Amino acid sequence: MSFNHKTIEELHDLLVAKEISATELTQKTLEDIKSREEAVGSFITVSEEAALKQAAAIDAKGIDADNLMSGIPLAVKDNISTKGILTTAASKMLHNYEPIFDATSVANAYAKDMIVIGKTNMDEFAMGGSTETSYFKKTKNAWDHTKVPGGSSGGSATAVASGQVRLSLGSDTGGSIRQPAAFNGVVGLKPTYGTVSRYGLIAFGSSLDQIGPFAPTVKENAQLLNVIASSDVKDATSAPVRIADYTSKIGRDIKGMKIALPKEYLGEGIDPEIKETVLAAAKQFEALGATVEEVSLPHSKYGVAVYYIIASSEASSNLQRFDGIRYGFRADDAKNLDEIYVNTRSQGFGDEVKRRIMLGTFSLSSGYYDAYFKKAGQVRTLIIQDFDKVFADYDLILGPTTPTVAFGLDTLNHDPVAMYLADLLTIPVNLAGLPGISIPAGFVDGLPVGLQLIGPKYAEETIYQAAAAFEAVTDYHKQQPIIFGGDK
């Protein structure tokens, strides 16, 4: 018997009643992972021995009835540090790296007696939108194995969507949680910048990165955010604000809520059927008592260009530490120090990572800094101001998560610009440091469509409230791919 159809609350009740043990739940989860892994390829590492050892220890002391997450398995994206478990960032550069410390988000999960079941596949160093740049494998979409799962947190999304695990962690720099959540029909939240500590996250774009949760439902997503969100003195960008319970508004009605629908989010490049899906969702919110009105975010069209200058510049700086000297891969054909640097980085990084390092180095160079990096920072401010103006009058922003549904494997990985444009609708949220969620909102050609809800900073509770209200009157989250046991 598989437990992957049970909610976290249902699993908790079974554990407290001793109808199952943490060890049995872990064993069943490992079986679910193994039976589906060949089809989807969600994991780089499955930490079977460590997980069973941890489960046995939890059983020995007993399940805490007041701790919802006690004994619950968790999959973790492979750019989040896990002590004693390989953390590769899906790169040859770190293919054998085993950290000696846990990321704060992982430590918080351990503190709640969650069981880290394994590390999920991703785009190398989180640079990509399809999980095709991984050094190890290409993950496949849970709904159609000829399609991409999205990225960069593709493995974390497919692990939940395919029923391998109930909960997982990802990271979002320009849409890397929300886009794969949309492509796989699950709930993925990018929290407000600073809500979840970045300590132990292998950095890509330090002013953009944020760890966040994946789950099958809105409430379970909020329950996982309750675990990982915390202020942290180890992270200089950690926010002091701490909401006690992100589920507190779930179940409340949304009568009187004002929701903005930016005309730019339904314009050029958006699949007409996705536009129809979003407009239908807007009518559903109106039926629930909310007001939905068209607004403008005029500078959002510059988001992709701004993002790839800023993110690549930050990446070129962050990735300087991978030099073949201290840890990770070192080229064995080097004869001197210069060759160690050059050969290690040439051989250790994949093409997309090298492309972004070069772009970032160029943008930061003395002759071009003002024209590119400085200018990008100025336009970023304009994008932030656009959001501020809208949120002065509205509670949330509504729109599609992605311009299209999941595209085919090996169709965009040789066209960087087309791949970058797939993040058109998610990038502005990271540039502004805002919270954003993707929830299932329909299907086009049998593939899931994600609906994005964006809020002002620290408005996760309101986002969850609206998302849960929509979820309660639709059944998209209940529909599952064949690999999970569904009929699609």
Curated annotation (Swiss-Prot):
Q: What is its EC number?
A: 6.3.5.7
Write out the catalytic residues in the record. 77 (charge relay system), 152 (charge relay system), 176 (acyl-ester intermediate)
Cellular component terms per the entry's GO annotation: glutamyl-tRNA(Gln) amidotransferase complex
An example of a GO molecular function for this protein is: glutaminyl-tRNA synthase (glutamine-hydrolyzing) activity
One biological process term from GO is: translation
User: Which keywords are on file for this protein?
Assistant: ATP-binding, Ligase, Nucleotide-binding, Protein biosynthesis
**Organism of origin:** Streptococcus pyogenes serotype M5 (strain Manfredo)
Query: Which Gene3D superfamilies would you find in this protein's record?
Result: Amidase signature (AS) domain (3.90.1300.10)
Q: Which family is it part of? A: Belongs to the amidase family. GatA subfamily.
Q: How does it assemble?
A: Heterotrimer of A, B and C subunits.
The catalysed reaction is: L-glutamyl-tRNA(Gln) + L-glutamine + ATP + H2O = L-glutaminyl-tRNA(Gln) + L-glutamate + ADP + phosphate + H(+)
Q: What is this protein called?
A: Glutamyl-tRNA(Gln) amidotransferase subunit A
- Record function comment: Allows the formation of correctly charged Gln-tRNA(Gln) through the transamidation of misacylated Glu-tRNA(Gln) in organisms which lack glutaminyl-tRNA synthetase. The reaction takes place in the presence of glutamine and ATP through an activated gamma-phospho-Glu-tRNA(Gln).
**Taxonomic superkingdom:** Bacteria
